[in-house]
């Protein structure tokens, strides 16, 4: 389908960040927040060339006067008009390409509603007139990027986490576990527990400040109860953060209480399993012969796995769950924040992948439902 000289575009639309770039590159060209901001107030200065909507970094920088909305929630697109704006911004402003000249690879969370992919396909072909496209599962691409063909991927982003077992390149769909608990829930939880300290964060713009605090200062405790004791007895764990207006706030046990939710979702009232239990459940749903290979190839990917201490804690929790003789290895590649994108870049530049694309002709013949037949 695609000629060898046309570079494919790889777009990893996360709930929190959009990563986009060209196939064959080793890192995404453009990484910007998946947000659309609309002005809260009427513009009164003539000639200011005000827009009705801002996307990505521009929305982030003007966040004080905007209402920020994320069109993707828990990995599912909830607002297609805003999603179209984000894609338009990706192609024309960030990558500066004409989408009608390049095949496009998109990514998706597993166990998503089928209508979500169909709509994605429809917009790509009908609004952006792409010559070809493909949709792949995020975790599968992360495994590509880690150079393995077998492993259990724990992919946790801003909107959704999932564990996917892959054996010799085949994903085992019956064993996928999806957890609607990820970075955004942690940010919301942090907003809540900072209120206990007397710091109130309420607006959509302030939520972004809390996200920044979360990304810079939090870590995962190896032993949560022990860490709580330490924090209560001394102020050694306290760190300060300077807000945009110059005020300095001090945070203590919030630093490790926030990401603890990943292991104990009951802290935010979610009746779900922690990420370690999800990984264990996934492996237990697989054939008994391949479990050993999965236990020693647990690959972390996505921005919510960037917390310091996550690998050690994961190893400890899984060792407690798994049979005592089992060797457990948790792999946390340094580039895991972008490993989905990197995997997409690798996959779409493989010569064997070229016949996998859904072409415009196939779409015209079968309509959006072709995506279920051709994509995993």
From Swiss-Prot:
Its EC number is 3.6.4.-. It comes from the Eukaryota. SUPFAM superfamilies: Actin-like ATPase domain (SSF53067). ACTA and ACTB are actively transcribed in mycelium, sporangia and germinating cysts but only at a low level in the case of ACTB. One of its GO terms (cellular component) is cytoplasm. It comes from Phytophthora infestans (Potato late blight agent). Belongs to the actin family. It catalyses: ATP + H2O = ADP + phosphate + H(+). Actins are highly conserved proteins that are involved in various types of cell motility and are ubiquitously expressed in all eukaryotic cells. Gene3D superfamilies: 3.30.420.40, Actin, Chain A, domain 4 (3.90.640.10). Keywords: ATP-binding, Cytoplasm, Cytoskeleton, Hydrolase, Nucleotide-binding. The lineage of its organism: Eukaryota, Sar, Stramenopiles, Oomycota, Peronosporales. It is found in: Cytoplasm, Cytoskeleton. It holds the Pfam family Actin. This is Actin-1. It is an enzyme of class 3 (hydrolase). The keyword Aminoacyl-tRNA synthetase does not apply. GO terms for molecular function: ATP binding; hydrolase activity. The keyword Zinc does not apply. Its main location: cytoplasm.
């Amino acid at each position: 389908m695609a000629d060898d000289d046309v570079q494919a575009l790889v777009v990893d639309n996360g709930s929190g960040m959009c990563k986009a770039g060209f196939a064959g590159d080793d890192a995404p060209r453009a990484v910007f927040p998946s947000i659309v901001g609309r002005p809260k107030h009427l513009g009164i200065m003539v000639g200011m060339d005000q827009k009705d909507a801002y996307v990505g970094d521009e929305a982030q920088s003007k966040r004080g006067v905007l209402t920020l909305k994320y069109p993707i929630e828990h990995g599912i697109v909830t607002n297609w008009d805003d999603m179209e704006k984000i894609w338009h911004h990706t192609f024309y402003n960030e990558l500066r390409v004409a989408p009608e000249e390049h095949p496009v690879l998109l990514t998706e969370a597993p166990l998503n509603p089928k209508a979500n992919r169909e709509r994605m396909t429809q917009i790509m072909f009908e609004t952006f007139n792409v010559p070809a496209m493909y949709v792949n599962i995020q975790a599968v691409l992360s495994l590509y990027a880690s150079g393995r063909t077998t492993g259990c991927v724990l992919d946790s982003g801003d909107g959704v986490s999932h564990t996917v077992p892959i054996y010799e390149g085949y994903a085992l769909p019956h064993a996928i576990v999806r957890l609607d608990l990820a970075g955004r829930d942690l940010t919301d939880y942090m907003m809540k527990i900072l209120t206990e300290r007397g710091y109130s964060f309420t607006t959509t713009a302030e939520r972004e400040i809390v996200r920044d605090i979360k990304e810079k200062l939090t870590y995962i405790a190896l032993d949560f109860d022990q860490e709580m004791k330490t924090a209560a007895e001394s102020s050694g764990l306290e760190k300060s953060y300077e807000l945009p207006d110059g005020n300095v706030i001090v945070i203590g046990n919030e630093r490790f209480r926030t990401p603890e939710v990943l292991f104990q979702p009951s802290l935010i009232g979610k009746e779900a399993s922690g990420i370690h239990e999800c990984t264990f459940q996934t492996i237990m749903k697989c054939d008994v012969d391949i479990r050993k290979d999965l236990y020693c190839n647990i690959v972390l990917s996505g921005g919510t796995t960037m917390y310091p201490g996550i690998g050690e804690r994961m190893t400890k929790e899984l060792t407690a769950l798994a049979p005592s003789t089992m060797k457990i290895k948790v792999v946390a590649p340094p580039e895991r924040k972008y490993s989905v994108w990197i995997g997409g870049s690798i996959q779409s530049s493989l010569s064997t992948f070229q016949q996998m694309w859904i072409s415009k002709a196939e779409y015209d013949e079968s309509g959006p439902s072709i995506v279920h037949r051709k994509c995993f």
